[in-house]
């Protein structure tokens, strides 16, 4: 027998028991006549004592070094009161070793568990990095999350159904990973960016509650929180309204937080996309931050200051204010830094007003724009923003999107810098009623979610006539400023689906080529259906308290989409390429 108990599971209830432990030497201390080691496995660490009473084990222990893989047979005893370690889960007990076996020795590690290693080192020697207790804990939490999700979905009548990994390329906003076919030379499969169409087809097949914990692939430029392969908790339902879908998924996430970290998230408020953008400058607002954005275009539209009056009088402009309570001590240097910061988002500047005395009107403020304002105007701004003495007001004025993005980013930065964001709180919400379409960089209409999202209360004819005023029957779940899941009611009318394709510039020939199977399926009594998908990696990040998505994936890629451990991607051998009828052009 190699193991009777896990190291990290031992406690006072095991005192007097004989145990067999298998794991690694975490630390070793030689005190002359006694040797102590901290022994580690996936459940934690326990102190093992080698005593002269068991001389053979003590002699063998003198050769132990960090990360040797060993087996201990011994007895659990209570630690003396003055040696209890309250920082360890097993700190009230230790194991007296009666026998020691070494499964395997270890070279000196290229990582140091007691100090910060570079990201490159950690990813190159990932199998060693995962031995660190905090990393093991992340993956155990991830396993706990998926176990809870499977249990919840099963209890609520959802069927776990797999969908294909080798599929057809579809335009979903990012580039596909392509897989060449050896049998069909010159043709390619695509790895799925999501199981979207297959789960809709499952609804058409009569499986009215589907879920899957599934790998998805996107060949996009990576950011810190993106990976080329990621995992979704994918869900689809038939005969359920959007509020019903949100309710059953909210209950799942509520239970997940309670089960994993013992936190009651309470009832999730619902907010429209328009309100989220206007008040918080983001479609994924972090409600732990009390700062809000307030519109003042109507107040400043006729002042003699073009920076404000031009956007205030434009249908596509915005003049907005953030009030920072007690922000009067923000220095000019800090204001200059914030001005530079909003420039990243396209803002041309950042006006400000410091309020020394709210009752003194213009005499009571300090501001480079005071000369353009009247007493009536400044009072109206004070009233609109609920300003007080000792506050500072920051103004953004530009095109609506630029001003909204810049002020939204500034709001988050101010919340962090000034300690206003309540980092110990959980603030979930649903964001609903997104625009159906948005303009891409070329000015063409693109689906804000995806082309299979249904509009709210629009006929195909109304949508064709006025696509930019359509609201999507879509919803995102947001927790602490992170979008953890998103979904929508799907189009189940073939005419509506063709109308959306047409608005997106997909002509009938392209529709048949890319989505013929879907358009055909929609003709055969398709039920109303809706669903959503959660990012498992993002959920795990939140529940483990890490801000690095790579910490919650066992073997992640770098931001350059490479695996430093296996050296993937790599060159293919010529014979394999020949069989695939592929010729690679090498860059010079």
Swiss-Prot record:
Origin superkingdom: Bacteria
Catalytic function, reaction form: tRNA(Asp) + L-aspartate + ATP = L-aspartyl-tRNA(Asp) + AMP + diphosphate
Annotated residues for binding of ATP: 218-220, 227, 483, 535-538
GO biological process: aspartyl-tRNA aminoacylation
InterPro entries in the record: Aa-tRNA-synt_II (IPR004364), aa-tRNA-synth_II (IPR006195), aa-tRNA-synth_II/BPL/LPL (IPR045864), Asp-tRNA-ligase_1 (IPR004524), Asp-tRNA-ligase_1_N (IPR047089), Asp/Asn-tRNA-synth_IIb (IPR002312), AspRS_core (IPR047090), GAD-like_sf (IPR004115)
Subcellular compartments: Cytoplasm
PROSITE patterns from the UniProt entry: AA_TRNA_LIGASE_II
GO cellular component, one term: cytoplasm
Alphabetical keyword list: Aminoacyl-tRNA synthetase, ATP-binding, Cytoplasm, Ligase, Nucleotide-binding, Protein biosynthesis
Xref: HAMAP family: Asp_tRNA_synth_type1 (MF_00044)
Primary role: Catalyzes the attachment of L-aspartate to tRNA(Asp) in a two-step reaction: L-aspartate is first activated by ATP to form Asp-AMP and then transferred to the acceptor end of tRNA(Asp).
UniProt subunit comment: Homodimer.
Protein name according to UniProt: Aspartate--tRNA ligase
Originating species: Histophilus somni (strain 2336) (Haemophilus somnus)
